[in-house]
């Protein structure tokens, strides 16, 4: 029996395959780009998260019977808004914190509420 851990970070998705005993069998990391459209802003394409996660899982599980994977857990960076269209597809890049358009609006609140 195997378990998969997936960490969607701001620079890469990191994946771990382990046995039920806790023995680590494989570790994979798949990078994706980070965009800086304006000073202080950072964005990523949610499609890159998905594509690299799927590629990473394929690579991670090479050589095992995938039917033996009993569970998968996901974790990721916080505060990344993904906006979807009517068909549930991302239609913009995801703004990341720190450094996003929202930080311009949040600054006055920081001053008003110490």
Regions found by a protein language model. Name each.
Residues 1-93, 106:
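N-terminal glycine/serine-rich phosphate-binding loop of ATP-dependent small-molecule kinases
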Residues 98-114:
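Glycine-rich phosphate-binding loop plus the immediately following alpha-helix
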């Amino acid at each position: 029996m195997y378990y998969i851990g997936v960490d969607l970070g701001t620079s890469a998705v990191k994946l771990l395959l382990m046995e039920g005993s806790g023995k680590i069998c494989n570790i994979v990391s798949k990078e994706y780009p980070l965009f800086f459209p304006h000073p202080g802003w950072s964005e990523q394409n949610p499609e890159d998260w998905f594509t690299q996660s799927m590629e990473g899982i394929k690579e991670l599980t090479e050589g095992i019977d995938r039917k033996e994977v009993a569970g998968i857990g996901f974790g990721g960076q916080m505060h990344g808004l993904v906006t979807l269209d009517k068909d549930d597809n991302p239609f913009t890049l995801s703004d990341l914190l720190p450094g996003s358009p929202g930080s311009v609006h949040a600054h006055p609140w920081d001053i008003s509420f110490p």
